[in-house]
Amino acid sequence: MSLSTASLAASKPVSTSELVQQSGYQQTWQKMVKGQKNLPVWARKGSGTSTPPEWVTWQGKKYQVGNICKPHDCANNFMYVAFSNDKKQVWGVRVEIADTPDALDHPSKHAKYQWLGKPDSQMKAMLTKQIESTPDWN
Protein backbone atom coordinates (compact mmCIF):
# COMPACT_ATOMS: atom_id res chain seq x y z
CA MET A 1 0.00 0.00 0.00
CA SER A 2 1.42 3.37 -0.95
CA LEU A 3 1.54 6.28 1.46
CA SER A 4 -1.29 8.10 -0.35
CA THR A 5 -3.46 4.96 -0.28
CA ALA A 6 -2.75 4.50 3.43
CA SER A 7 -3.69 8.12 4.13
CA LEU A 8 -6.92 7.72 2.18
CA ALA A 9 -7.81 4.53 4.06
CA ALA A 10 -7.10 6.21 7.40
CA SER A 11 -9.40 9.13 6.59
CA LYS A 12 -12.31 6.94 5.44
CA PRO A 13 -15.27 7.50 7.78
CA VAL A 14 -16.29 4.55 9.94
CA SER A 15 -19.72 3.12 9.16
CA THR A 16 -22.32 2.66 11.90
CA SER A 17 -21.92 -1.14 11.82
CA GLU A 18 -18.12 -0.73 12.18
CA LEU A 19 -18.64 1.72 15.06
CA VAL A 20 -20.81 -0.82 16.89
CA GLN A 21 -17.90 -3.29 16.86
CA GLN A 22 -15.48 -0.85 18.52
CA SER A 23 -14.57 -1.04 22.19
CA GLY A 24 -16.92 1.00 24.34
CA TYR A 25 -19.65 0.93 21.73
CA GLN A 26 -19.83 -2.87 21.57
CA GLN A 27 -20.48 -3.28 25.30
CA THR A 28 -23.23 -0.67 25.22
CA TRP A 29 -24.76 -2.33 22.14
CA GLN A 30 -24.82 -5.71 23.87
CA LYS A 31 -26.71 -4.20 26.82
CA MET A 32 -29.29 -2.71 24.44
CA VAL A 33 -30.04 -5.96 22.60
CA LYS A 34 -29.85 -8.29 25.61
CA GLY A 35 -33.20 -9.93 26.25
CA GLN A 36 -34.84 -8.50 23.12
CA LYS A 37 -37.27 -10.98 21.59
CA ASN A 38 -37.66 -11.50 17.83
CA LEU A 39 -34.52 -9.55 17.01
CA PRO A 40 -32.88 -10.81 13.80
CA VAL A 41 -29.20 -11.77 13.89
CA TRP A 42 -28.09 -8.79 11.76
CA ALA A 43 -29.75 -6.39 14.22
CA ARG A 44 -28.57 -8.25 17.32
CA LYS A 45 -24.96 -8.10 16.10
CA GLY A 46 -25.23 -4.60 14.64
CA SER A 47 -23.88 -5.93 11.38
CA GLY A 48 -25.25 -4.96 8.03
CA THR A 49 -25.15 -2.30 5.40
CA SER A 50 -24.66 1.13 6.94
CA THR A 51 -23.46 4.66 6.47
CA PRO A 52 -21.18 6.70 8.75
CA PRO A 53 -22.99 8.02 11.83
CA GLU A 54 -23.58 11.73 12.28
CA TRP A 55 -23.56 13.92 15.37
CA VAL A 56 -27.05 15.18 16.15
CA THR A 57 -28.00 17.65 18.87
CA TRP A 58 -31.44 16.94 20.34
CA GLN A 59 -32.93 18.63 23.39
CA GLY A 60 -29.52 20.21 24.08
CA LYS A 61 -27.64 16.88 24.13
CA LYS A 62 -25.30 15.40 21.51
CA TYR A 63 -25.86 11.92 20.10
CA GLN A 64 -24.04 9.88 17.51
CA VAL A 65 -26.83 8.70 15.20
CA GLY A 66 -26.61 6.16 12.42
CA ASN A 67 -28.50 3.52 10.54
CA ILE A 68 -27.94 -0.14 9.77
CA CYS A 69 -29.98 -2.29 7.43
CA LYS A 70 -30.32 -5.96 6.65
CA PRO A 71 -27.96 -6.81 3.79
CA HIS A 72 -29.79 -7.05 0.45
CA ASP A 73 -33.07 -5.94 2.09
CA CYS A 74 -32.53 -2.33 3.16
CA ALA A 75 -35.94 -1.10 2.02
CA ASN A 76 -37.77 -3.60 4.22
CA ASN A 77 -35.52 -4.06 7.27
CA PHE A 78 -33.50 -1.27 8.84
CA MET A 79 -32.78 0.40 12.13
CA TYR A 80 -31.70 3.77 13.46
CA VAL A 81 -29.57 3.99 16.57
CA ALA A 82 -28.39 6.83 18.81
CA PHE A 83 -25.39 6.59 21.12
CA SER A 84 -25.07 9.02 24.00
CA ASN A 85 -22.06 11.33 23.80
CA ASP A 86 -20.31 9.34 26.57
CA LYS A 87 -21.06 5.99 24.83
CA LYS A 88 -22.72 4.69 28.00
CA GLN A 89 -26.16 4.31 26.47
CA VAL A 90 -27.64 3.47 23.09
CA TRP A 91 -31.23 3.48 21.92
CA GLY A 92 -32.62 2.18 18.68
CA VAL A 93 -35.64 1.42 16.61
CA ARG A 94 -35.84 -1.47 14.18
CA VAL A 95 -38.29 -1.01 11.33
CA GLU A 96 -39.78 -3.87 9.36
CA ILE A 97 -41.92 -3.32 6.27
CA ALA A 98 -43.85 -6.05 4.49
CA ASP A 99 -42.62 -6.94 1.01
CA THR A 100 -45.81 -5.92 -0.78
CA PRO A 101 -46.28 -3.23 -3.43
CA ASP A 102 -48.54 -1.06 -1.23
CA ALA A 103 -46.18 -1.33 1.75
CA LEU A 104 -43.18 -0.38 -0.38
CA ASP A 105 -45.09 2.55 -1.92
CA HIS A 106 -46.32 3.77 1.50
CA PRO A 107 -43.91 2.38 4.10
CA SER A 108 -45.07 4.64 6.94
CA LYS A 109 -48.54 3.07 6.80
CA HIS A 110 -47.23 -0.49 7.04
CA ALA A 111 -44.15 -0.22 9.26
CA LYS A 112 -43.70 -2.33 12.39
CA TYR A 113 -41.44 -0.80 15.03
CA GLN A 114 -39.30 -2.51 17.65
CA TRP A 115 -37.87 -0.08 20.21
CA LEU A 116 -34.53 -0.99 21.76
CA GLY A 117 -32.75 0.36 24.84
CA LYS A 118 -35.95 1.60 26.52
CA PRO A 119 -36.09 5.04 24.87
CA ASP A 120 -38.24 7.69 26.54
CA SER A 121 -40.74 9.74 24.53
CA GLN A 122 -38.12 12.36 23.59
CA MET A 123 -35.68 9.74 22.29
CA LYS A 124 -38.51 8.04 20.38
CA ALA A 125 -39.31 11.42 18.80
CA MET A 126 -35.69 11.91 17.74
CA LEU A 127 -35.41 8.41 16.26
CA THR A 128 -38.78 8.82 14.53
CA LYS A 129 -37.54 12.06 12.98
CA GLN A 130 -34.56 10.14 11.58
CA ILE A 131 -36.89 7.58 9.98
CA GLU A 132 -39.12 10.29 8.54
CA SER A 133 -36.11 11.93 6.90
CA THR A 134 -35.47 8.74 4.91
CA PRO A 135 -36.00 9.28 1.17
CA ASP A 136 -39.32 7.86 -0.04
CA TRP A 137 -40.75 7.63 3.50
CA ASN A 138 -44.42 8.48 3.13
Language model segments and positions:
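Short beta-strand segments that buttress and anchor functional surface loops
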Residues: 65-71, 94
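C-terminal partner/receptor-binding element of secreted or periplasmic proteins
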Residues: 11-29, 99-138
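Short, surface-exposed coil-to-beta transition loops
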Residues: 73-80
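N-terminal secretory signal peptides
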Residues: 9-65, 138
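N-terminal signal peptide c-region/cleavage motif recognized by signal peptidases
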Residues: 4-7
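Catalytic Cys-His active-site segments of thiol-dependent hydrolases/isopeptidases
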Residues: 91-98
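Acidic/His-rich structured neighborhood in mature extracellular/periplasmic domains
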Residues: 66, 88-90, 110-111
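A short, structured loop/turn motif at beta-sheet edges
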Residues: 56-59, 83-89
